[in-house]
Amino acid sequence: MKLNIAILLAALAATASASPAGDISEVAVDADASELLVDPRAELPVAPRASFFIDARQDTNGTSQDEIDQWLTAHNDERAQHGPVPLVWNQDLQNAAMSWASRCVYKHNRGGQNIAARYNTRANFPREIDRAVGQWNNERGEYNATTFKGAGHWTQVVWKHSRNLGCAAYSCPQGTLGKKPGDKWKSLWYYVCNYDPKGNVVPASKYYPSNVQP
């Protein structure tokens, strides 16, 4: 699927959690979240096996329990405002997210998936998971409850029948994620979240009204 990249530039010094003066950050969110076409007669997919054991020994691109809590909090705080039950962490979905994120290719590899990227001119810039999910959540004001368009990432975050979540944040090397080798971007974070059952199911007129509550 061809992705249109929406680029937002901001000086982090102007934000509440400002970085040292001079640092520039760029966020990329694919403009078109994927929709899942299903047979209306089909049952919702069965969630993969859940596992909640996380090895405390994590490398730079691992996912610690603290980071899992950040992913869940960023999603479930938003869901709490719109009716759905909280998502629970799923190790299989996380493993799939990490496997894809580690390729550092900026595109979807499945339905029921949100992606985003964050670049910074400073090396070793932190993950900032809350900002990645916050970028998706900020689409809520763009959602059109008549056409069901305009907020594909947000609708997946709050999709009522989604129950399981697995995410990964991966530090990609320079020259990937659409950037050129040797350019100013020193930190390139790639964020991938997988959801099950998958959201954004079409036909939209049948599935969105019962799954998305503005």
Swiss-Prot record:
Secretion signal span: 1-18
Main location: secreted
Glycosylation sites per record: 61, 144
Pfam families hit by this protein: CAP (PF00188)
PROSITE patterns found in the cross-reference section: CRISP_1, CRISP_2
Record's subcellular location: Secreted
GO cellular component: extracellular region
Residue ranges occupied by any SCP domain in the UniProt entry: 72-195
Keyword terms: Fruiting body, Glycoprotein, Secreted, Signal
PANTHER family associated with the record: CYSTEINE-RICH SECRETORY PROTEIN-RELATED
Family, as annotated: Belongs to the CRISP family.
Protein name: Fruiting body protein SC14
Organism of origin: Schizophyllum commune (Split gill fungus)
Lineage of origin: Eukaryota, Fungi, Dikarya, Basidiomycota, Agaricomycotina
Underlying gene: SC14
